[in-house]
Regions:
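N-terminal helical cap/lid subdomain that shapes the substrate entry/recognition surface
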Residues: 2-88
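A short, structured active-site edge motif that brings together acidic residues
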Residues: 121-135
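Acidic, Mg2+-coordinating phosphoryl-transfer loop and its flanking beta/alpha structural elements
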Residues: 156-196
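Substrate-recognition element of Asp-dependent hydrolases with the DxDx(T/V) motif
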Residues: 23, 89-115, 128
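Conserved H-loop
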Residues: 33, 120-125, 151
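Short secondary-structure boundary segments
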Residues: 105, 179-181, 200
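Conserved Lys-Pro-Asp/Glu-containing loop-to-beta segment of HAD-superfamily phosphomonoesterases
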Residues: 3, 137-165
Length: 209
């Protein structure tokens, strides 16, 4: 592989606590019933606006995004931790001279800040997220490929949800499903990823199979 794209939430970082609290705060602030925890967990992966569009009246969606991002920026992001073995895995991949990038649906400034705060920004040549022009995972992947002039056939995305796999397949890069994150492995297998990995330290060996 000439490049690896990493999803952030659920792949590199366990951000479930901060994300859950941010959604709960948003629904409380809007004075609407909170979804149950299973539903909130399903929001971890797709674009933020898509989750609110599926659960709120259209008139409240933009307000919900603003409330969520403000709370997450001020409090939620600081409740994230790296998954075990992530740093060791990144060092091993870096030792193989494989360029690493983050491609996430998370708002780009927040993604950059989170990677810096958790001490992993130094392992990545680029950290790309959503903005007004890049909403879906495929948009972020397309941008990262273009700005770095990377070959699709030698690039893979590593992620824990179907949205990572769909994004990669839409653009035409290889896909690796990981089992330690927010996604359900049985569901991931339905999307026929090129690789399946059960531990961060197995990423390199899995790619070489």
């Amino acid at each position: 592989m000439q490049a690896l794209f990493f999803d952030l939430d659920g792949t590199l970082v366990d951000s479930s606590k901060g994300i859950t609290e941010s959604f709960q705060h948003t629904f409380d602030t809007l004075n609407v019933p909170q979804p149950d925890l299973k539903t909130i967990r399903s929001f971890m992966g797709p674009p933020l606006i898509s989750s609110f569009e599926a659960t709120l009246p259209e008139a409240l969606v933009d307000q919900a995004v603003t409330i969520y991002r403000q709370y997450y920026h001020e409090k939620g992001q600081y409740k994230s931790t790296l998954f075990p073995q992530i740093v060791e895995a990144l060092k091993a991949l870096q030792g193989e001279n494989i360029p690493l990038y983050v491609t996430t649906s998370k708002h780009e400034p927040v993604a950059l800040q989170m990677c810096q705060d958790l001490g992993i920004a130094k392992y990545f040549k680029g950290i790309y997220g959503s903005n007004s022009d890049r909403i879906h995972k495929a948009d972020v992947i397309r941008y990262a490929l273009s700005i770095n002039d990377l070959p699709k056939e030698e690039t893979a995305i590593i992620g824990d949800t179907k949205f990572d796999l769909i994004g990669g397949q839409t653009i035409g890069i290889k896909t690796m499903a990981v089992s330690w994150g927010f996604g359900d492995l049985e569901e991931l297998l339905l999307y026929s990823p090129d690789f399946i990995c059960h531990s961060p330290l197995e990423i390199l060996s899995t790619l070489k199979k």
